[in-house]
Amino acid sequence: MQFRRIDPTPFTLKEFLQPFTLFKYPSVVVPTIAYSIIFGFCSVLLTVEIPQLFLPKFHFDPQAIGLQFVSIIIGTVLGEQLGGRFSDWFMGHRHKQIGRKPAPEHRLWLSYIGYTLVVVGFIIFCVQLENITTYNVTPVVGVAIAAAGNQIITTTLVTYAIDCHVEQSGSIGVFVNLVRSTWGFIGPFW
């Protein structure tokens, strides 16, 4: 197997710096920052805190701790299925109502569902973790709900940014991942 570049022209510095030019577009920067913060809470914080909280409270071994993360997988898969399909349906329905392609901002209404699920999921996780004395699955049900909300927000906000600047879609993906990864690294320190 050989890795090579599809385009025969050599890499240039401009190609590496081009995603940084997206900082000039609020329609890319604002959703990226909003998504990165939610990602920091729903993915990074939960994966760091579950072992820290469950080990002393329930005396779990590494396998039992690892099984708690299945809730993130389940929530993410469900959130993607709901978020992607509903987002496309929502925009298609609006297209039929007004007889033309709706503005990309119309899609942002769906992110409220995701934000609500994140808050509800965190409330369930925190309250149930505090109240139970012997383990039951209710705290990780909250984690799954928050993960579903995270994925709905991901789908909605990234698709919105791409809808606003279709010609920059590849760079938007790089930009979102750069900001998200940077925020995910910084997040656990505060």
Model-derived features: positions:
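Central mid-sequence intracellular linker of multi-pass
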Residues: 1-26, 85-97, 103
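Generic, low-specificity signal for short hydrophobic/alpha-helical stretches with a mild N-terminal bias
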Residues: 2-5, 10-11, 15-18, 36, ...
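Hydrophobic alpha-helix/TM-entry signal in multi-pass membrane transporters
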Residues: 14, 27-32, 111, 139
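Short acidic/histidine-centered micro-motifs embedded in hydrophobic/aromatic stretches
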Residues: 25, 35-36, 175
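Structural motif
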Residues: 26-27, 58
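A single, central transmembrane helix in multi-pass transporters
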Residues: 30-40
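C-terminal transmembrane bundle
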Residues: 39-190
